[in-house]
């Protein structure tokens, strides 16, 4: 007998199953996708012991003709494609013809299927046909998989914990449900219903069923298109985040896919609105010509290759960015304070309007998609548990201690000063702190102009050409309210009011945002302004780092950092940009060089962004710094002029909002509707 021989069909199927059927979730995925491809409108998934004991999928789809049932269990047998051209225009979820034979080769499979005219029951175990018989059934398919991996114990041994395997099944079903909102899905584990969608074609209803009504209310619809691509979906407001990227779902032509570039594009669309290490909930549905996407990359069909991927990524990021510009991003304090109880939803509860993305998230001059308008009919009818807030707020007008009074003084650029740039607010140390009348604040600002960054000085008001001209940075009162200062709490938070309630602001985050927008613009400008050093800075690095640094010298020079070789592995710096914080010049330069050493693909834009964030944080006031009334009011007056006054550059919220009704509820001046009925 020769050394080379053909493998048996059963062994070949078991080998193929190693790629197609990795875990119980893989079985669920393949069977549910088959049901969707068969035009099912209702799919029930019944799982026992995380799928290891049994998996049953019932659908009302087309069914399989009795003459083709055996063919369906042969390798590479499919109804999805017939020619080579079809492979480049795949519209179905499955097309490789590997799922059923792969599953049948490593498990016990019983399938009952009917086209409505005739029905068939078939039984496979370990790839061998045990029984086939007629079975009168309604139209659809009912397939049960038991004893998974009974003949491949190594695969069974390396399964994760039951909780992890169940979580994988949930993730698979969730993503398919998000891909096909017109199909009603029901997932039951050990007789407990874990997921139920209504199948009414409304994506936001499905999001509510998966992530909860409270979270769905904090998501906004997005739409965008180019010549080649069409985009729709929902993205969470920046306050609704998770610790991992797995809550970002990208769908291409109805298929949930994994693509690192598109996931990054979603995150990029939020910019600095997200906290560091936090990621949004997002469902991005993309439609394109099948010729632009190759799904025949891996048997699981989750990894795809995209034509024009940079253009698609740009569409995703810009659509999200533009949408969030129109949304009031001030979070409700009560919504984020209490602990929310998980809601168990029935189908009736899912038929609610979530487009009221809550009155606290008002959208300016945007039309609502038709699907969301249908949703907008009954959010008030949803059964909600009121957030309980036991937080007590104590406001006092106590003056700062003598030590703290001597510690701070604000220098705030005048809106009518000669430079119309968005200057950062500087808090500097002084021996004495004397109160300044509001009317004399501009004069005080001029007298302290030496503390201005970038070596600038303010022109006298009477000679300023900008003094009589209307400011170009009028506060956007529709997006951010004009606040009236009330007081300071613990030297960290500012209390303010507006017509719609009370606001609490993090003074560090607020000033950091103001500074960031100034530095982002200033660092991006080519400026010859340099501050000479009395004592040059000497920087020593190992040889491997020196080679990398020399490659990046042009990039450093664009930001005004000029390194000169100083023999061996050393560099010397004679001057630095004027926007460096005094006393931290060497630390700042070293930190910037470290960025380049850690990421050799860092672009100029990314480098400037990181520099702006670093400088804005270094020059912002910290917690436990008491401000006088003029300083606090100046901070509140400057904040609305920011492009994004809602978050600091690291994504932390600048302010939270207690509405008038929130305050009345906390003090029991009004009752929630469900309390009134009790």
From Swiss-Prot:
One of its GO terms (molecular function) is mismatched DNA binding. One of its GO terms (cellular component) is mismatch repair complex. One of its GO terms (biological process) is mismatch repair. InterPro entries: DNA_mismatch_repair_CS (IPR014762), DNA_mismatch_repair_MutL (IPR020667), DNA_mismatch_S5_2-like (IPR013507), HATPase_C_sf (IPR036890), MutL/Mlh/PMS (IPR002099), MutL/Mlh/Pms-like (IPR038973), MutL_C (IPR014790), MutL_C_dimsub (IPR042120). Signal peptide: none annotated. The keyword DNA damage applies. Pfam families: DNA_mis_repair, HATPase_c_3, MutL_C. This protein is involved in the repair of mismatches in DNA. It is required for dam-dependent methyl-directed DNA mismatch repair. May act as a 'molecular matchmaker', a protein that promotes the formation of a stable complex between two or more DNA-binding proteins in an ATP-dependent manner without itself being part of a final effector complex. HAMAP family: DNA_mis_repair. PANTHER family: DNA MISMATCH REPAIR PROTEIN MLH, PMS, MUTL, DNA MISMATCH REPAIR PROTEIN MLH1. Belongs to the DNA mismatch repair MutL/HexB family. This is DNA mismatch repair protein MutL. It comes from Lactiplantibacillus plantarum (strain ATCC BAA-793 / NCIMB 8826 / WCFS1) (Lactobacillus plantarum). The lineage of its organism: Bacteria, Bacillati, Bacillota, Bacilli, Lactobacillales.
């Amino acid at each position: 007998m020769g050394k080379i021989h053909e493998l048996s069909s059963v062994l070949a199927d078991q080998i193929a199953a190693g790629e197609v059927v990795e875990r119980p979730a893989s079985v669920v995925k393949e069977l549910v996708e088959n049901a969707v491809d068969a035009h099912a409108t209702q799919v029930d998934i019944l799982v026992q012991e995380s799928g290891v004991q049994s998996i049953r999928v019932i659908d009302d789809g087309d069914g399989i003709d009795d003459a083709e049932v055996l063919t369906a269990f042969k390798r590479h047998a499919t109804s999805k494609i017939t020619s080579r051209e079809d492979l480049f225009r795949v519209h179905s979820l499955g097309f490789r013809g590997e799922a059923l034979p792969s599953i049948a080769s490593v498990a016990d499979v019983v399938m009952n299927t009917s086209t409505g005219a005739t029905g068939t029951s078939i039984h496979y175990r370990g790839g061998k046909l045990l029984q086939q018989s007629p079975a009168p059934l309604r139209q659809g398919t009912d397939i049960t998989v038991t004893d998974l991996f009974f003949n491949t114990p190594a695969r069974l041994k390396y399964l994760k914990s039951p909780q992890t395997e169940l979580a994988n099944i949930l993730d698979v079903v969730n993503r398919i449900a998000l891909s096909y909102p017109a199909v009603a899905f029901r997932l039951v584990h050990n007789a407990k219903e874990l997921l139920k969608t209504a199948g009414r074609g409304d994506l936001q209803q499905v999001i509510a069923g998966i992530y909860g009504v409270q979270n769905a209310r904090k998501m906004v619809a997005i739409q965008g298109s180019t010549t080649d691509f069409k985009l729709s979906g929902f993205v969470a407001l920046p306050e609704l985040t998770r610790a991992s990227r797995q809550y970002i779902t990208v769908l291409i032509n109805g298929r949930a896919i994994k693509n690192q570039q598109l996931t990054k594009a979603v995150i990029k669309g939020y910019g600095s609105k997200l906290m560091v290490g936090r990621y949004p909930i997002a469902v991005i549905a993309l439609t394109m010509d099948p010729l632009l996407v190759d799904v025949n990359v891996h048997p699981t069909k989750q990894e795809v290759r995209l034509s024009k991927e940079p253009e698609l990524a740009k569409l995703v990021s810009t659509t999200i960015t533009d949408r969030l510009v129109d949304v009031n991003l001030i979070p409700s304090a009560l919504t984020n304070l209490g602990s929310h109880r998980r809601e168990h939803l029935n189908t009736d509860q899912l038929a609610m309007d979530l487009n009221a993305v809550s009155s606290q998230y008002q959208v300016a001059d945007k039309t609502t998609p038709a699907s969301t308008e249908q949703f907008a009919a009954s959010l008030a009818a949803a059964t909600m548990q009121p957030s309980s807030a036991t937080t007590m707020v104590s406001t006092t007008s106590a003056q700062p201690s003598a030590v703290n009074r001597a510690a701070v003084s604000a220098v705030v650029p005048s809106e009518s000063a000669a430079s119309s740039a968005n200057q950062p607010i500087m808090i500097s140390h002084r021996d004495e702190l004397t109160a300044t009348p509001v009317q004399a604040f501009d004069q005080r600002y001029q007298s302290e102009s030496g503390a201005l960054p970038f070596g600038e000085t303010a022109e006298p008001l009477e000679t300023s050409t900008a003094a009589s001209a209307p400011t170009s940075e009028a506060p956007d009162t529709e997006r951010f309210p004009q606040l009236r200062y009330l007081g300071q709490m613990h030297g960290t938070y500012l209390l303010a009011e507006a017509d719609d309630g009370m606001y609490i602001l993090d003074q560090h985050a607020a000033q950091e945002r103001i500074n960031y927008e100034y530095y982002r613009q200033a660092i991006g400008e080519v400026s010859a302004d340099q501050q000479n050093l009395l004592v040059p800075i000497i920087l020593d690095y190992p040889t491997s780092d020196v080679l990398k640094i020399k490659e990046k010298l042009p990039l450093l020079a664009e930001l005004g950092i000029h390194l000169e070789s100083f023999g061996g592995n050393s560099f010397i710096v004679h001057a630095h940009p004027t926007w460096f914080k005094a006393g931290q010049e060497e630390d700042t330069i070293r930190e910037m060089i470290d960025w380049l050493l850690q990421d050799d693909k860092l672009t100029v834009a990314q480098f400037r962004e990181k520099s702006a964030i670093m400088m804005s944080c270094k020059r912002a006031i910290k917690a436990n710094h008491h401000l006088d009334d003029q300083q606090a009011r100046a901070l509140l007056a400057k904040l609305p002029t920011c492009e994004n006054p809602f978050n600091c550059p690291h994504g932390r919220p600048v302010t939270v909002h207690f509405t008038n009704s929130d305050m009345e509820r906390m003090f029991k001046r009004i009752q929630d509707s469900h309390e009134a009925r009790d």
